[in-house]
Amino acid sequence: MVKQFNIAICGSARVGKSTLVNALCGKEVAKTSSSLCSATDEMKKYVLNRSCQSVNEAASSIEYSITVWDTPGIESWTIDNVQKHFTKIMLESTPLCMIYCASPGSFARLDQLQWLVETCIKSNIFCALVCTNKYSGGNQQRTQVLNDFHSLLTHYHTMTRDEANIKYYGNVALCTSVNSIIYEDIDIGVRKGVEGINELIFGIITSLKDDKLVAWCYTIAENQLFWSTMRDKVVELFNISRPILEELLQKHGKDIARYLIPLIMKAAFKK
């Protein structure tokens, strides 16, 4: 049995969409480019196929197929473009979430983003609005991007909490800022490491339910840094027995995700 899901990555060209996809997945899934001609009019897709490791030996095998869609630069979109692209995505398989990227100082039209967010929320698609390349502009530009995100999302849901540099709007949306790869400016002697990726992944985990939650976990299954760094938070969130997990890891190796995701499934479908 194959369960199919889609993730849409949206935003203007050259804001770090592909870099973010690779950082989330923990490996190179999407091709990156520094070219000024990196915009494209066609959607690209990257398919991740995962086999479900059931905690119940007798259970039938389940495959999860997750397609990550890298959409064309949104700056040229009209409302018809939004509807066309998302109709295509929704007809392909179950939409999991939409991740919108904007970097400090990048071109953004809030009316287009509003169409996008409204389309997703009406279709029960979780929205993550992300300020990418957070150090590529000044603090003022970064703050402006995040303020625009917050202002837009409060039209659809009040902010329910603010944790680990992430603002949550119920189980409808979140917004945050990240640095997907090391940022370095030799001229002024600034070097910033990767920031916010683990927190973003965990934030989406806390916001999704049932099969969408499981599909997201399989999307980031190979991100070993996330699973090793955030294991305790995941175990606490789903009230997973630590002794059981430790026993599995000692017996079968240190691939945390392989044994933790089935335990997450068991806890998620029990709720």
Q: Where do the language-model regions lie?
A:
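Conserved G1/Walker A P-loop phosphate-binding module
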Residues: 1-72
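Extended hydrophobic secondary-structure segments that form protein cores and membrane-embedded regions
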Residues: 7-9, 67-71, 100-101, 130-131, ...
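Residue-level signature of catalytic and energy-coupling elements of molecular machines
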Residues: 20, 99, 200
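Conserved C-terminal guanine-recognition region of P-loop GTPase G domains, centered on the G4
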Residues: 59-63, 84-170
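Flexible beta-alpha connector loops of hexameric P-loop NTPases
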Residues: 72-80
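Canonical P-loop GTPase G-domain recognition
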Residues: 135-212
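C-terminal accessory extensions appended to soluble enzyme cores
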Residues: 196, 201-239, 260
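Membrane-inserting effector segments that mediate pore formation, membrane fusion
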Residues: 231-271
